[in-house]
């Protein structure tokens, strides 16, 4: 076993190799502080036939024992990955995926298992570091060293590896990953930071990444690694030459510039089919079928090259826009009659239907994960059905991509939400992607912002998002605004920025190339700001402020604060009182016994108000001389017991009765006055009458209102 240690940026990094998981192609145990992960990398012996991508899978396993916890719920064992585990897996996947050879077709699985956590150093950061080492010490073809760092902005200063307390005060919470040469991945949220602040954070993060990579280089120098030789399949020279000759550059250009995603896609498919059939006729169906994946790859390369040259040489994009142009935008609100808020945002051929649902405090998402416990009052769920891209696929649960896109949009919007004291509702946004041709996550931000205002949620301002792209060639560097799906696929960078008029609230970047300079990043950020401000104007033109009232179909929620020591009075023995209130007034009641906050929820404001009035009555301090209309609950030879308010019963002694005890019935209503409260809080009552002629002890009998009297 070999161990390496180094202090970097005030954190101790420790790496162990050769002790555990020796059957994997590569394995390390990496530790920062007390957060420890085991990262393994394994590659299959044979290639997967008939695919045109690198079959990489990254799994992030949370083990509750790492935090000294036992999983909650009925089954005391970890099940399917939590949302945070999926997001952490994506954080590791995105910076390492571009570093595999494009021709690799052997399955590769990277598994990062959290085996200890100190709740200070987040496991995803350690996971990127460990995965990079596991791949580099293995024989798996992998070209690069990566590392990641979390960045905060506290009191105007950039903080690397911020603690949980610092993040609570931080204006920025981003994860930055990269190689020694460039930043390759960014993901995070902000509280309206400026473009210059974001750029400084990225540059400071890259300096830290270089220090971590230097430590990785020291570790890797110990190994004499011989990478597996994966033969790259190529087309026979004769067929490749003929295929290139059959590709007419002008026709390819004309087909690429056909307007409309579907029409363009069909035209390009037809052109490939035409060339394919010519080759089939010349070389035979069997031979060409064997080479079909390679031919598709070659065609894809030609399309990528041609699209990029059109942009560079002609300054025109596939939909005839200039680099800074934004596609036509339309916005609508209030589309659906019964939902609490709705909006349709359409930008070119990308369309998101945003729906807001308002719920009670008990509708909050319960979180019981490795690092977090508690509840979450704002949720955004992103759905990407196959029809949005004109495809047929099985409908299953949400994909990792859907979870990741929803999380990004949620982070973009949460900063503008009102606090719970001002707006005590649980808020859920669902984004239905109805059509997609690039930047559907940023369309989700826009539809979500519109739908929140349509629902009457008092958000402070609109939030909009835009996706940027990059074409990086030797002769030019072109930043593209509001990218199409093809520009994302064949371009060099996907750069998403969301925010308000006053700053950035969410940020995501994936870069496929090295050599992205600070100047280029600054240019992209400033161009994104121009685009964001333009989109925001469209949102404000549609709905400029939240509606004054909530939907009539939204629940009514009213909150009162009581002395926490009196919570038991509302609950009652065995929950008797609160159950009666819920039943009698047709409401839901949520009580926080720590803060004394009581939320009353119902479909009818009058019933909610009546329930609150009754709660106030229950909590009212009872004094000698107070008069109540109470219900007889028990009769004894010495007197009767009368409930004057829920849970508060006093003794009405027979000597204090005006009425003959023999005529009193259980359930009837009596007017009583509090005559005494002893030192144990017990109530003594006397029957009360407005008439001065009625005296206690003078027995009289008369018909009085009783429960169920006819």
Curated annotation (Swiss-Prot):
Residues 625-688 form the S1 motif domain. It is found in: Cytoplasm. Residues 688-710 are annotated as: Disordered. The keyword Cytoplasm applies. Residues 555-615 form the KH domain. GO terms for biological process: mRNA catabolic process; RNA processing. Residues 691-700 have a biased composition (Basic and acidic residues). Residues 701-710 have a biased composition (Basic residues). Gene3D superfamilies: GHMP Kinase, N-terminal domain, K Homology domain, type 1, Nucleic acid-binding proteins. Mg(2+) binds at residues 488, 494. Belongs to the polyribonucleotide nucleotidyltransferase family. This is Polyribonucleotide nucleotidyltransferase. The gene is pnp.
């Amino acid at each position: 076993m070999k161990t390496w240690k180094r202090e970097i940026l005030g954190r101790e990094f420790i790496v162990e190799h050769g002790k555990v998981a020796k059957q994997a192609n590569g394995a390390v145990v990496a530790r920062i502080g007390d957060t420890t992960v085991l990262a393994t990398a394994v590659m299959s012996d044979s290639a997967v036939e008939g695919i045109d991508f690198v079959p990489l899978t990254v799994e992030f396993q949370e083990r509750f024992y790492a935090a000294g916890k036992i999983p909650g719920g009925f089954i005391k064992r970890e099940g399917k990955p939590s949302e945070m585990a999926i997001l952490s897996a994506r954080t590791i996947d995105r910076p390492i995926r571009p570093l595999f050879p494009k021709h690799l077709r052997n399955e590769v699985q990277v598994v990062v298992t959290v085996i200890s956590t100190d709740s200070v150093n987040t496991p995803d950061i350690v996971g990127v570091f460990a995965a990079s080492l596991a791949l580099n010490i293995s024989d798996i073809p992998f070209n690069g060293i990566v590392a990641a760092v979390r960045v905060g902005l506290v009191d105007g200063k950039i903080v690397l590896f911020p603690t949980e307390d610092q993040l609570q005060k931080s204006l920025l919470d981003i994860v930055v990953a990269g190689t020694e040469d460039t930043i390759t991945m960014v993901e995070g949220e902000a509280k309206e930071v400026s473009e210059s602040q974001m750029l400084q954070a990225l540059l400071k993060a890259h300096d830290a990444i270089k220090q971590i990579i230097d430590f990785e280089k020291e570790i890797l120098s110990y190994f004499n690694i011989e990478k597996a030789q994966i033969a790259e399949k190529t087309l026979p020279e004769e067929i490749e030459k003929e295929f290139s000759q059959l590709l007419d550059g002008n026709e390819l250009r004309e087909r690429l510039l056909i307007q409309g995603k579907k029409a363009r896609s069909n035209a390009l498919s037809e052109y490939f089919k035409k060339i394919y059939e010519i080759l089939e006729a010349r070389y035979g169906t069997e031979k060409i079928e064997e080479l079909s994946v390679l031919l598709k790859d070659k065609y894809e390369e030609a399309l990528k090259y041609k699209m990029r040259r059109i942009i560079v040489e002609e300054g025109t994009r596939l939909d005839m826009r200039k680099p800074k142009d934004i596609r036509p935008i339309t916005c609508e609100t209030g589309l659906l009659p019964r939902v609490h808020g709705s909006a349709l945002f359409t930008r070119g051929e990308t369309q998101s239907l945003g729906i807001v649902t308002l719920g009670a405090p008990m509708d909050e998402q319960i979180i019981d994960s490795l690092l977090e416990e508690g509840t979450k009052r704002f949720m955004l769920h992103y759905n990407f059905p196959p029809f949005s891209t004109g495809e047929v696929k099985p409908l299953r649960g949400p994909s990792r991509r859907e979870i990741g896109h929803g999380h990004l949009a949620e982070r973009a919007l949460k900063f503008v939400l009102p606090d719970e004291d001002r707006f005590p509702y649980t808020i859920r946004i669902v984004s239905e992607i109805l059509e997609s041709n690039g930047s559907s996550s940023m369309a989700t931000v826009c539809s979500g912002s519109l739908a929140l205002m349509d629902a009457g949620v008092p958000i402070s301002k609109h939030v909009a998002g835009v996706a940027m792209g990059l074409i990086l060639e030797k002769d030019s560097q072109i930043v593209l605004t509001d990218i199409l799906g093809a520009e994302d696929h064949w371009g060099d960078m996907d750069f998403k920025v969301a925010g308000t008029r006053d700053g950035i609230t969410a940020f995501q970047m994936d870069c496929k190339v090295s050599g992205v300079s600070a100047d280029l990043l600054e240019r992209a950020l400033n161009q994104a700001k121009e685009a964001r401000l333009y989109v925001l104007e469209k949102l404000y033109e549609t709905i400029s402020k939240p509606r004054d009232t909530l939907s009539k179909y939204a629940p009514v929620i009213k909150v009162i604060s009581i002395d926490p020591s009196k919570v038991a009075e509302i609950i009652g023995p065995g929950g008797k009182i609160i159950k009666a209130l819920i039943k009698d007034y047709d409401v839901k009641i949520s009580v926080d016994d720590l803060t004394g906050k009581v939320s009353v929820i119902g479909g009818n404001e009058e019933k909610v108000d009546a329930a609150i009035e009754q709660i106030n009555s229950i909590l009212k301090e009872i004094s000698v001389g107070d008069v109540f209309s109470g219900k007889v609950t028990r009769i004894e030879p010495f007197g009767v017991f009368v409930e004057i308010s829920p849970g508060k019963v006093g003794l009405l002694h027979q000597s204090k009765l005006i009425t003959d005890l023999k005529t009193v019935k259980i359930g009837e209503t009596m007017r009583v006055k509090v005559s005494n409260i002893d030192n144990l809080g017990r109530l003594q009552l006397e029957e009360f009458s407005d008439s001065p002629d009625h005296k206690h002890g003078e027995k009289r009998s008369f018909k009085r209102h009783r429960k169920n009297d006819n």
